[in-house]
């Protein structure tokens, strides 16, 4: 016997939208901070790790989504700034 999927309430949709918006703001601010340059490579990596932790806190069990959506942006930026290959 299969159960029908439940439809999320407006409050649940609003809450998820707030969490998405918060994560997007943090990611954009983190990218901007790293892009300013002048910080050690390790500090840039710590910023990425902090953004990843926030994503996992906001969306438990969805760390793979961060890796698909945001990690490539961080990698491109860090590679360009620190001339990594």
Protein language model features and the residues they cover:
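Short, solvent-exposed positions on alpha-helices
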Residues: 42-46
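Helix-rich interaction surfaces within compact, conserved domain-sized segments
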Residues: 50, 54-85
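Mature extracytoplasmic or otherwise solvent-exposed domains
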Residues: 22-23, 32, 49, 79-81
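Interaction-prone helical segments in low-complexity regions
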Residues: 1-3
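N-terminal acidic leader/helix
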Residues: 5-41
């Amino acid at each position: 016997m299969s159960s029908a999927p439940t439809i999320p309430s407006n409050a649940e949709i609003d809450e998820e939208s707030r969490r998405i918006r918060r994560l997007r703001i943090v990611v954009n601010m983190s990218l901007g901070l790293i892009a300013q340059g002048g910080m050690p490579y390790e500090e840039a990596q710590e910023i990425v790790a902090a953004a990843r932790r926030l994503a996992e806190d906001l969306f438990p069990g969805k760390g793979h989504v961060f890796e698909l959506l945001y990690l490539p942006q961080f990698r491109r930026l860090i590679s360009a700034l620190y001339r990594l290959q």
